[in-house]
Amino acid sequence: MGCVHCKEKISGKGQGGSGTGTPAHPPSQYDPDPTQLSGAFTHIPDFNNFHAAAVSPPVPFSGPGFYPCNTLQAHSSITGGGVTLFIALYDYEARTEDDLSFQKGEKFHIINNTEGDWWEARSLSSGATGYIPSNYVAPVDSIQAEEWYFGKIGRKDAERQLLCHGNCRGTFLIRESETTKGAYSLSIRDWDEAKGDHVKHYKIRKLDSGGYYITTRAQFDTIQQLVQHYIERAAGLCCRLAVPCPKGTPKLADLSVKTKDVWEIPRESLQLLQKLGNGQFGEVWMGTWNGTTKVAVKTLKPGTMSPEAFLEEAQIMKRLRHDKLVQLYAVVSEEPIYIVTEFMSQGSLLDFLKDGDGRYLKLPQLVDMAAQIAAGMAYIERMNYIHRDLRAANILVGDNLVCKIADFGLARLIEDNEYTARQGAKFPIKWTAPEAALFGKFTIKSDVWSFGILLTELVTKGRVPYPGMNNREVLEQVERGYRMQCPGGCPPSLHDVMVQCWKREPEERPTFEYLQSFLEDYFTATEPQYQPGDNQ
């Protein structure tokens, strides 16, 4: 339920639009035009025809200069029109002598924006010159500078952020439309007795003359005017707009402008502060870089992999950028190898499910975590890359149940005999597709098999797959056609997806693109009668 303060704030006249709600499970991404309440929303998405929709073609890696598109939002395209005055959206503490500390609201002249994620700027308040992260600033008086503007995030991520604990009814954000170029979407947190907390989406269309509207009866010159209008009155929306959705501090792709291109760093620049875990091939630590920046450091036992091969693979890993992948920041390539990544507060998904707050999660949260992992793997799929070791132990969890994929690509480099034998004690047989375990044929489709096993880890809160069976028995039984039965508390429709992932023929397994779509819309399209108390 929404907080009392916000309920009072939007009561009275602001409730005028509450009678215009949509049916419990609209298939459209958007609520209807608030002045056109036909109620004709009955279609359920056809997941069998998912690939008939237009999708972006795969983008292969194209050499050292390749940086794929992602949700690390920079504004390099904004400055093309001669805009040089920018405003800080967040506080930033300098990490090296080359960059500037600044406060939210501070203004800058941009001197040089050719360095990609780091721009050279001069502060108008202090006169100091240095580098600033480009995704921490926006042009003064632009829509990008507004608290409520979230840019290029998808519908599902908008819902995740709006439904975070502590947000009230009427919390809102505006984002780029996923379906209509040049249009925007307004996403609002709502509440009613039938559905509880949920999010409604309204498309903001653009007039040929340049104005904006949700309904043609109310047109505005700017998005800012539209927002102010709906702050003052619901006017057919589910409720008045109350407060902008809180924004998390953006993720940086590099430790600093210095490590952008030269990201082999000296071991002495790292301080290992707290051991977070032990693995078969090393340890994971929480630490700091340069005494300023919190990081996670994976230390590998000497002999685990060739430093030369690791450095070559790390060149590719560094270029993979997506908000559902743990960002690789830097490496120490001499043994013992150190891998420096972003820090994730809740640790591995496996530990989180078994011993952390994950023990108390219900099915909707577990399915959403699966959808996040599928989104990250769909990106890896588009990039023509392979993970090779996808399981809950290699997924990391942050605040607000954010999940990110870690250790992608590293399994290929391990030189330990107990691992490379594939049936050895250290090899994750229970997660590995039979063609990969028996013949070494690792593909994105063997990752899909592993994802099906990971789904069982989620719904069983970290139980080891194939309970009661050892590795040899699993390999033999799977080859004979055995597949795990539906775990307790798991809906049959979710088990059906697992079984699809475990098809004998790799090409018959679904794509991660499909799995992401299926899981993101799972409770709308597959389990419309689900009640929150159904899964403990």
From Swiss-Prot:
Residues 270-523 form the Protein kinase domain. ATP binds at L276, G277, N278, G279, Q280, F281, G282, E283, V284, K298. The lineage of its organism: Eukaryota, Metazoa, Chordata, Craniata, Vertebrata. May participate in signaling pathways. The keyword Transferase applies. GO terms for biological process: bone mineralization; cell differentiation; cell surface receptor protein tyrosine kinase signaling pathway; defense response to Gram-positive bacterium; integrin-mediated signaling pathway; negative regulation of natural killer cell activation; positive regulation of cell migration; positive regulation of cytokine production. The active site is at D389. It comes from the Eukaryota. It is an enzyme of class 2 (transferase). There are elevated levels of this protein in neural and hematopoietic tissues. InterPro entries: Fyn/Yrk_SH2 (IPR047924), Fyn/Yrk_SH3 (IPR035750), Kinase-like_dom_sf (IPR011009), Non-receptor_tyrosine_kinases (IPR050198), Prot_kinase_dom (IPR000719), Protein_kinase_ATP_BS (IPR017441), Ser-Thr/Tyr_kinase_cat_dom (IPR001245), SH2 (IPR000980). A lipid is attached at C3, C6 (S-palmitoyl cysteine). It catalyses: L-tyrosyl-[protein] + ATP = O-phospho-L-tyrosyl-[protein] + ADP + H(+). Residues 10-36 are annotated as: Disordered. Keywords: ATP-binding, Kinase, Lipoprotein, Myristate, Nucleotide-binding, Palmitate, Phosphoprotein, Proto-oncogene, SH2 domain, SH3 domain, Transferase, Tyrosine-protein kinase. It holds the Pfam family SH3_1. The gene is YRK. Residues 148-245 form the SH2 domain. Phosphorylated. Signal peptide: none annotated. Its EC number is 2.7.10.2. This is Proto-oncogene tyrosine-protein kinase Yrk. GO terms for cellular component: actin cytoskeleton; aggresome; plasma membrane; ruffle membrane.
